[in-house]
Every structure is written in C-alpha cells, then in structure tokens.
C-alpha cells in the first residue's frame, strides 16, 4: 500500500532531536544530478549485511516532493542497501529544505567519504558553490537550514573552509567539471 506524505507512518523514534519515520522505498526518489555514484562494491556488501543484521542505524534525510513521495538528500547508499537486503522501507528524517539548502546538505553529508572520485568531488563542490552563490543576500534565510553564516566571505572561501581544501584546490576541482566526460574518466583513473 502506498502512502502519501500526509499518510506516512508515525515517527518510530528520535534521532538527535528529530523524528524518524519509516518511508516505503517506492516513495523515495534520487536527488536530481546527484554527483555521488552508488557503487555495489565491498563497502556496499558490508552495508547490506549490516542492514540485514541490525537495520539502518542512521536515518536518511529526505524532503517532500511536490509530485508525491520524497527526494533523498542524504541516504542514497542506505536506500540501495535496503533494496539489496530485501527491506521495504527506510528510516528517514523529513525536512522542508529549499533547493539550495538541499544541495548544500547533500554535498556536506557526502564530501568527507573516502571513496570519492575526483570527478564526483569536483561536481559536488561546484554544486555547493553555485547554491551558496544563489543564496546571495539570503544567507539569513537559509543559514539555519545548513548551519553556517557567510561572515562576508566569498562563496569559494566558504566552500574551501567547509571541505577542508584550499581555495585554489577548490577552484582546480571545479575546473575539472569543464572537461569532457572522457577526460574526467581518465582523471578518475589517474591516467
């Protein structure tokens, strides 16, 4: 049985002060142009086994879709692990996020992973930079959603500080996005 946003299951628990709800996998949609690939590698196999044994320990973060269901902001790998483990729902925190806040949260929740290809990091940093630039004078409206203030800094400096990269390294990564997909693949393969 499919549930609408209004009919979703009641919260099952609290996670860091937020209500967690089981959402059927069929109602979860990937974030558009999400730069991080969901690989079915050893780490995924281990995640699937963990989901089978313990369930999903950290809930996904989703936002309601206007067309129904939910868009995954953080939790694409957990959703795939649930599919492979044979479960039908994913514990998630539902947040009302505008597009820019969702992009920033998506990038921030994935950028520190160890297995990120240079092209993925480049696209993620570019997405975050563009989202911060779009916010412009609206930092006061969205800073609570993403947890920072600009303090008059340039967008690229904010991205650099939050990603642990230098400003020039962030700019180099972003230039990678201008390469053809074939050249990006060669960079990813270190060729």
Residue positions per predicted region:
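The C-terminal cap of the DNA-recognition helix in HTH/winged-HTH DNA-binding domains
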Residues: 53-56, 179, 188-189
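Short, charged/polar connector segments at secondary-structure boundaries
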Residues: 1-95, 101-115
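Amphipathic, charge-rich alpha-helical segments that serve as recognition/docking helices
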Residues: 36-37, 44, 80-178, 184, ...
């Amino acid at each position: 049985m499919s549930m609408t946003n209004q009919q979703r299951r009641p919260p099952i628990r609290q996670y860091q002060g937020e209500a967690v709800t089981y959402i059927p996998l069929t109602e979860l949609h990937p974030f558009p142009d999400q730069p991080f690939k969901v690989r079915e590698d050893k780490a995924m196999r281990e995640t699937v086994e963990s989901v089978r044994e313990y369930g999903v320990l950290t809930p996904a973060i989703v936002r309601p879709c206007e067309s129904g269901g939910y868009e995954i902001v953080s939790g694409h790998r957990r959703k795939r692990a649930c599919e492979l483990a044979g479960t039908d729902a994913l514990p998630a925190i539902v947040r009302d996020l505008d597009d820019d806040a969702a992009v920033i949260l998506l990038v921030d929740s994935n950028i520190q992973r160890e297995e990120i290809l240079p092209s993925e990091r480049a696209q993620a940093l570019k997405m975050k930079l563009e989202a911060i630039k779009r916010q412009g004078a609206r930092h006061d409206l969205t800073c609570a959603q993403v947890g920072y203030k600009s303090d008059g800094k340039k967008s690229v400096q904010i991205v650099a500080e939050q990603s642990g990269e230098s400003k020039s390294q962030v700019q180099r990564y972003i230039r990678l996005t201008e390469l053809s997909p074939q050249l990006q693949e060669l960079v990813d393969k270190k060729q």
